[in-house]
């Protein structure tokens, strides 16, 4: 990342006085970072979703393709811009230090229940698909769309920007 501008910094202050903390955080704020204060416990709970779930799903895509024997190169002629972005995320993660991700994923005590919920969600969606009827899938989709209603507009705009950048490069 070339700059802190727009990056998120989670501050979990412990054993630091308020003046020293304010001075430290002001360095990040001057560089354009967004600061969120959190307890260590809340940080780990949220990171179980923000990092743990996200990276686990990315690794699951890679593992699934490897098990199927479908290389990223073989999918090239079939890829859509969204798929290309997904493959970029997979490739980016796999090009990094595995120890960083091993520590991040294995040392967060809140991640196992998140992954259990993910497995249950995947099983629910799989059952809906395997039913051969569109109704169960539509029901899941509608519930999830309602839950995410607060971000769907901005998410569409942001991903439209990414897709446009992908197809114009």
What would you call each of these model-derived segments?
Residues 74-151:
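Interdomain hinge/lid region at the active-site interface
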Residues 1-34:
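Rossmann-fold dinucleotide-binding core
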Residues 48-89:
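Amphipathic alpha-helical blocks and their helix-capping loop/short-beta junctions
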Residues 31-53:
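Conserved Rossmann-fold dehydrogenase catalytic segment
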Residues 142, 146-169:
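Composition-driven low-complexity repeats that form or flank extended alpha-helical/coiled-coil segments
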């Amino acid at each position: 990342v070339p700059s802190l501008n727009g990056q998120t910094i989670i501050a979990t202050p412990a054993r630091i006085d308020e003046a020293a903390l304010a001075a430290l955080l002001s360095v990040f704020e001057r560089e354009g970072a967004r600061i969120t204060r959190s307890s260590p416990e809340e940080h780990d709970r949220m990171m179980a979703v923000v990092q743990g779930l996200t990276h686990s799903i990315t690794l699951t895509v890679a593992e699934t393709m490897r098990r199927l024997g479908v290389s990223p190169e073989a999918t090239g002629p079939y890829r859509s811009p969204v798929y290309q972005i997904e493959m970029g995320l997979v490739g980016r993660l796999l090009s990094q230090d595995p120890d960083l991700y091993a520590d991040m994923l294995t040392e967060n005590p809140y991640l196992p229940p998140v992954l259990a919920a993910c497995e249950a969600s995947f099983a629910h969606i799989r059952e809906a698909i395997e039913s051969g009827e569109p109704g169960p899938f539509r029901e899941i989709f509608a519930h999830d769309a309602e839950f995410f209603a607060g971000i769907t507009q901005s998410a569409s705009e942001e991903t439209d920007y990414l897709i446009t950048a992908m197809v114009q490069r």
